[in-house]
Design a protein with these regions (language model features):
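Alpha/beta hydrolase fold serine-hydrolase catalytic domain that processes acyl esters and thioesters
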Residues: 2-167, 188-370, 443, 448-461
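Acidic, glycine-rich calcium-binding repeat modules characteristic of RTX/beta-roll
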Residues: 354-433, 444-446, 477, 481-584
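Short His-Asn-centered micro-motif
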Residues: 122-124, 171-173, 201-205, 377-378, ...
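Gly/Ala-rich beta-loop-alpha elbow adjacent to hydrolase catalytic centers
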Residues: 172-176, 180
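Short glycine-enriched nucleophile-adjacent loop
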Residues: 181-188
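Generic recognition of long tandem-repeat/solenoid scaffolds
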Residues: 107-109, 121, 404, 409-418, ...
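Low-complexity acidic/polar repeat-biased segments
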Residues: 418-469, 585-624
Length: 624
């Protein structure tokens, strides 16, 4: 599983294809504007001003290694096929071949021996006012037939070099992304259907071809251009389907990635919530659209250590703050008018600099990346990787509010006494606590034997924290029954003691069984089965399609993360000894504020932060 999975390619192949296509798309967007070497100019300005730390990443405006522009001679076309801006001309049905109308770059990838390996059609985004008139015919498709002359030459070049349509990438950014989606829509008829099996990647596209097996569409939730006209039949229909004031309706499609936030300076500012998310609000609503051309957020998503747990629509927050705001702004899944995913599991990804990252109310994944980061956990079962640098993990309360465990590989677990979720941490060197302000500047050091207190100038007053004892599983399939156990990898079977246990399955498809005491069950990553029993039990399925088994002894069970991650399909299976029919189950279920409570006799279940209809839809009664 991966956010950028596409067609039948492996996850690694999909990532390479997508990130390459994105680079090609942004290159075409900035290259040769007004006939100037603007791609080189952008790189020079970035190197002189931005790349020293002002911008959140090193801007790379050039082509990926091995790629070059293909000339008219390469494609057996006359020199007039390219305009004075160095772009291939596509005639507009309205403006004809007017300079800076519809354009494209045709690019080739060559191996070390000089052999052509792939070809790309990268449609150009808006680079002059001439393009504006073509916005109004994207949905109706009048432009599609005019692509045929150039695409015919591309087809012939591909075949002449022994390649096929599956060796072709079709991409573009902004308007260029819209043209890539338009070509995808007409792939069966253009040039005899040759490009039906090409690889289509739309970047920040206003138009959406909603065919997930054909096109991968990527953009940012806080980019007003992305999905603005959707897949409506005409631009008039798109306006009618949108919100008043030309506000982006934030529609979802099967081919789009829908919950990614580029957390930039504008998104962090008060202006974000005070002004409309309208296509007409260029200074505010277009900020991420422009930022997306230069950001390396796509690479940071793909390279983060939690990528394998991400689904197509996982809530993803990517730090993209400048040096002006980076040191004073917490990057988080914030509650705002442009978001409908607040409270879901979020993947929060830092930059190469010193970031402030903060978890929310769900079980989040936080990755610092390079730099000396401060990472603050939230209310759920969070997982943290500090990355490179000297990173500080900040926890709620005081050190006395936590039990701390350390595994043989250095992984830390922090179990909160107040039941706000287990925190897993890797790659962090320091620990601080919200209620111990001295620890903010003099944090505890993580050592092999415990947390070393540095708050006092006199070591006699130190309150070092020793690690608690726990049983650690192997990378295989373990069967364990102890007080505190961390299963690690493998498909484990973990059983609680009668006195109560802390069970953590780790990665893999695990079975966790509660006992007669008060238990905390954490399935973590994988498709897990969690069995509730007597006592006060807290069940966290984690990322994956988890099953919660509920028998008659479950007298005080709390499911803490039901379908919390986008893409999860959790289920509740009730024993027939509890409810004899779905009608009886429905009669016992009630919405109580944000939770669902199911109670009958001694049986009592609370599904936190859930809707009654969703819980009942995901429930079944079983025998055995």
């Amino acid at each position: 599983m991966g956010m950028f999975d596409y067609k039948s390619y492996s996850s690694e192949e999909s990532v390479e294809l997508f990130t390459t296509a994105y680079r090609l798309a942004t290159y075409a967007n900035i290259a040769g504007i007004a006939g100037l070497p603007t791609e080189s100019m952008v790189q020079s300005i970035s190197d002189a001003v931005l790349n020293s730390g002002l911008y959140p990443n090193v801007v790379n405006a050039g082509l990926p290694d091995g790629w070059r522009e293909l000339t008219p001679t390469d494609l057996s076309l006359p020199a007039s096929a390219v305009d004075s801006w160095g772009q291939y001309i596509i005639a507009s049905p309205i403006t004809g071949e007017m300079l800076s109308g519809p354009q494209a770059k045709i690019l080739g990838e060559y191996d070390a021996q000089g052999n052509l390996t792939r070809v790309a059609v990268s449609f150009t985004g808006t680079n002059s006012p001439v393009d504006i008139v073509d916005y109004f015919q994207l949905n109706t498709g009048e432009l599609a037939p005019n692509m045929a002359p150039l695409l015919t030459a591309v087809r012939d070049f591909v075949l002449k070099n022994g390649l096929g349509a599956d060796d072709v990438i079709v991409t573009g950014y902004s308007l260029g992304g819209g043209m890539a989606n338009l070509m995808a829509e007409y792939r069966e008829s253009l040039v005899g259907g040759f490009f039906a099996d090409a690889n289509y990647v739309g970047c920040a596209s206003p138009l959406i071809c909603d065919a997930p097996g054909v096109v991968l569409n990527y953009g940012y939730e806080n980019d007003v251009v992305y999905r603005i006209v959707g897949d409506e039949a005409t631009w008039q229909d798109a306006i009618a389907a949108g919100d008043p004031g030309l506000v982006n309706p934030d529609n979802r499609y099967d081919s789009t990635r829908d919950n990614i936030v580029l957390f930039d300076d504008m998104y962090a500012s008060p202006l974000w919530s005070l002004t409309p998310f309208s296509i007409a609000n260029i200074p505010v609503a277009w900020y991420a659209h422009i930022d997306g051309v230069f950001s390396d957020a796509t690479l940071r998503i793909a390279n983060n250590p939690f990528y394998e747990f991400m689904a197509r629509d996982s809530t993803t927050i990517v730090a993209n703050l400048s040096a002006l705001t980076r040191g004073i702004t917490w990057v988080q899944d914030k509650q705002t008018v442009t978001s409908d995913h607040y409270g879901t599991t979020a993947f929060i990804i830092g930059s190469q600099y010193d970031d402030l990252l903060q978890g929310g109310v769900a079980g989040d994944y936080l990755y610092g990346g390079a730099g000396n980061d401060t990472i603050k956990t939230g209310a759920g079962a969070d997982r943290v990787d500090g990355g490179a640098g000297k990173d500080n993990l900040r926890l709620e309360g005081s050190q006395s509010d936590w039990d701390v465990y350390r595994l043989s590989d250095g992984t830390l677990f922090f179990n909160a006494h107040n039941g706000t979720g287990l925190k897993q941490a890797e790659g962090v060197e320091q620990i601080s606590f919200e209620n111990e302000w001295l620890s903010w500047t003099r944090p505890y050091d993580v050592t092999a034997s415990g947390l070393e207190d540095n708050r006092s100038l006199i070591s006699w007053f130190d309150q070092d924290v020793a690690y608690r004892k726990a049983t650690e599983g192997t990378t295989g399939n373990d069967v364990l029954s102890v007080k505190a156990v961390f299963g690690q990898d493998g498909n484990d079977v973990l059983t609680a003691l009668s006195s109560g246990s802390l069970l953590h399955g780790g990665e893999g498809n695990d079975a966790l069984k509660g006992g007669s005491g008060n238990d905390a069950l954490y399935g973590a990553e994988g498709n897990d089965v969690l069995y509730a029993s007597a006592g006060y039990d807290q069940l966290y399925g984690g990322v994956g399609d988890d099953v919660f088994r509920l028998g008659a002894s479950a007298n005080n069970t709390h499911i803490m993360d039901f379908n919390q991650a986008n893409g999860d399909h959790d289920r509740l299976l009730f024993a027939h000894t509890v409810f004899g029919s779905t009608a009886a189950l429905g009669a016992a279920a009630h919405q109580v504020a944000n939770d669902v409570v199911i109670a009958q006799g001694n049986f009592h279940l609370t599904v936190h932060d859930a809707l009654l209809q969703e819980v009942l839809y995901s429930s079944a009664i079983i025998v055995g």
